[in-house]
Amino acid sequence: MSQLRCNGKVPTIVFGEVARDIVACKEVVDWLKSPVPGFEDFIVIITDSAVEYEERIDAFLQSVVNGRLYYMVLDMNDSLDRQRFRNKWMSYNIIGGNKVETVIQILHNIYAHILKTGMISYDFTDLQYILKQGCFVQSVCFKGELSDWLESFHAQANASYSFGLTLNLDEGEGVKDNLYVLHERLCRLGNNPEVKISLQSYEDEEMETIVIWTYDDEY
């Protein structure tokens, strides 16, 4: 199964509660001691400065990486050291953009550097299962109106991606309007994309989580 770890303020803002600082890695060590049968393991580390956090990333990798673990480091800040990092780490790449584009780029990197290269044997059905279980990027939360960030969304050549959206329930009609705008926009993506919407209520918060799945049949 997969894990997401972040370093720096920018990744934490992008991924919210999904982001975990790599210093707090006890649960990862415990998880590696009891792997899920039939699944290879990989970790995605996201940082807003590989130069600044290089020692912390190295320390984390030394504490959890063994012969069967694959990992990648994604940097939200390009630097002159990028070639050195590519030579040093198993997989290193530069990502950036807004919240939605960042998630799509992460999935693209997983496909290009881990799945497509044959490092592990996941296909896209397996990747969807992993994402749905929340072991990787389960959701990116957007509160309030959806129109603003929808305008910045551009479909890229990814075969699989997902979103988790959180809406305030202060105005019931506003939620309906947002869902209509969201559904209309997603239906324009790719070749016959499938849109699935699931509503879940939190008992401790007056909010609903909307999980949207879309996928294209061509990469």
Question: Residue ranges of each PLM-predicted region?
Answer:
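Tubulin/FtsZ superfamily GTPase core signature
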Residues: 1-219
